[in-house]
């Protein structure tokens, strides 16, 4: 898999309790095929955070990678926006 063909997603960190792992909530919008209304879909991804820089509430960018564990297929690219606490 080429580096530029990997999926890159932007989402919000909802959990950082695991060691070197964050849970990222990614929200997407799709048009309903019949009613043509925009419907919001959300999905959680587990991502590898080697330096443990991401905290809850941060907006982050994650990239698809080889499987790192049973459920972890993404890694943290960068923190786009820090959470305001």
Swiss-Prot record:
GO CC annotations on file: cytosolic small ribosomal subunit
Known role: One of the primary rRNA binding proteins, it binds specifically to the 5'-end of 16S ribosomal RNA.
Lineage of the species this protein comes from: Bacteria, Bacillati, Mycoplasmatota, Mollicutes, Entomoplasmatales
Similarity-based family: Belongs to the universal ribosomal protein uS17 family.
Organism of this sequence: Mesoplasma florum (strain ATCC 33453 / NBRC 100688 / NCTC 11704 / L1) (Acholeplasma florum)
GO terms assigned for molecular function: rRNA binding; structural constituent of ribosome
Keywords: Ribonucleoprotein, Ribosomal protein, RNA-binding, rRNA-binding
Pfam families, per database record: Ribosomal_S17 (PF00366)
Subunit structure: Part of the 30S ribosomal subunit.
Annotated gene: rpsQ
Matches recorded under InterPro entries: NA-bd_OB-fold, Ribosomal_uS17, Ribosomal_uS17_bact/chlr, Ribosomal_uS17_CS
One Gene Ontology biological process: translation
Stated name of the protein: Small ribosomal subunit protein uS17
């Amino acid at each position: 898999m080429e580096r530029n063909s990997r999926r890159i997603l932007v989402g919000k960190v909802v959990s950082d309790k695991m060691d070197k792992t964050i849970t990222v909530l990614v929200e997407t919008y799709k048009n309903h095929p019949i009613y043509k209304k925009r419907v919001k879909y959300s999905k959680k991804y587990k991502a590898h955070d080697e330096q443990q820089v991401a905290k809850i509430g941060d907006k982050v960018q994650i990239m698809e990678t080889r499987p790192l564990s049973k459920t972890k297929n993404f890694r943290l690219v960068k923190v786009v926006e820090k959470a305001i606490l």
